[in-house]
Amino acid sequence: MAKLGTMPPQHAAKPVDEHAARLIPEDSVPIQTQKPFTTLSAIGIGYGVTNTAVGIPLILSTAMPMGGSPQVFWGFLAMAAVGLATATTLAELVSAMPHPGGQYIWVNALAPKRYRRGLSYTTAMISWVAAVATGSSGNLSVPLNAFSIVTLLQPDFVYRRWMGFAAFQAINVVTCFGACFEHALPKLSKAFLLFNVVSVGVIIVALFAMADARTSAKDFFTTVNTSGWPDGVAFIIGLNGANWCFSCLDVATHLAEEIPSPGTNIPKALLWTIFIASTSGLLVVLAVLVNLGPVDVSDYSGIGIFYRITGSKAAAIGLWIPVLILVLASVWSIQTWQSRLAWTISRESGFPLHRHFSKIFPAPFYTPIWSLVGSAVGTALFGCLYLASELAFNSLIATGILLQYISYSIPTVLVLWQGRRNFRHGQFWYPRLGLVANFIMLAWTVVAFVFYCFPANAQVRPSQMNYVSGVLVVIATFIAALWILYARKNYRVMEI
């Protein structure tokens, strides 16, 4: 039976019984004393969310109409560079200040005293909403891509929104339960990492082995833009898909209390995640584009492309099922991500019901169960929006990646504002390369913030409109209202 106890904030860094999970009352910091993660399992859960190689077939339907093969190839390389810059930026910050709160803790440490609480809370809520929006996207992606198998076998099948909604909510419940057991998380993350690598290898070999023809050099490098936007604008808008393949990089930073030596192990996990993502993702990009043949805009769904290349429905389905399993696994990883954010924010009294959300449950869980449930409820509510309006739901989940970049940018700007030379850095620190990485990430944040608010087609109909900018205003209003009505009086960062 695990021991229960308290730990005052000023003593939170002292060695503790590694087998004890502590439930902490008011005026103390609830800490996670279980440290089952290693660098490898942190890579597994981080890459499990990023899911780069598996994500390539999923984003082709949105990327190919914006520029064809060059859009996918050069766009992937561009986003790999942005991903490396983002991972480097986060690695420097977590090396200096390892903490499961991540971005909002860094902001609290770096911001001027006058603005510290407000900026820290804003960053915290942006991070959490980004995680819930991303999880909602994954919850819907699984059933939509599962029903694509039905469509391949039965072309007259008519998808109904309630089908996706029911599957969305079922997946939300199952993955929430699967994230409840602390000591199972690293084992599952390593297992899924291995399954991911093997599946990607099988997909690459199968596409090359079963393709009847190869794409000509002319087709490979010919831009095919059917969006109505100028080629340059279409290219940037089309980067959204590849950008998702290098998103959610802060996941590993929120494991700081669940891994030994987080100041060194988490930066390693971040950079290894980018290396694995870039290598495996590029191989899948080449496997698809080299074997796709002449550009045909009729069907760029992932399973449709697998069928087109292999010429076999059975082979296409056989390759598609591992993709679905890995997308489902990414939703499980996201449940861990968003719950850890809710838990740490609750430790600072950032949520109503924070006394419940901040608790670490004893054996056999050792996890913040109420934070898991609360975050899953938030995801479920987002799913209800899908049932009401698919357009509103799509605009909401599209904000996920922008909110991530905003949460990364706030502490980065504060580091630059006070001067990198004055920053008390950790072991992972590159004075010049780190500065370049900071500017690349910030520059891309600005570009993405502008162009990701554009609709995919220049000749847009109301049913295709992009309401991301409006959703961002709603989210900002929600955070401001929560601050004024609750957090201004209750929120306090106790760790720093």
Swiss-Prot record:
It holds the Pfam family AA_permease_2. It is a multi-pass membrane protein. InterPro entries: AA/rel_permease1 (IPR002293). It is found in: Membrane. Glycans are attached at N225. Keywords: Glycoprotein, Membrane, Transmembrane, Transmembrane helix, Transport. Disruption phenotype: Leads to lower intracellular accumulation of SW and higher extracellular yield of SW. The chain crosses the membrane at residues 40-60, 72-92, 124-144, 162-182, 191-211, 270-290, 314-334, 368-388, 396-416, 434-454, 467-487. GO terms for molecular function: transmembrane transporter activity. GO terms for cellular component: membrane. Belongs to the amino acid-polyamine-organocation (APC) superfamily. Amino acid/choline transporter (ACT) (TC 2.A.3.4) family. Transmembrane transporter; part of the gene cluster that mediates the biosynthesis of swainsonine, a cytotoxic fungal alkaloid and a potential cancer therapy drug. Does not mediate the secretion of SW and the exact role of swnT in SW biosynthesis remains to be determined. PANTHER family: AMINO-ACID PERMEASE BAT1, CHOLINE TRANSPORT PROTEIN. This is Transmembrane transporter swnT. It comes from Metarhizium robertsii (strain ARSEF 23 / ATCC MYA-3075) (Metarhizium anisopliae (strain ARSEF 23)). The gene is swnT.
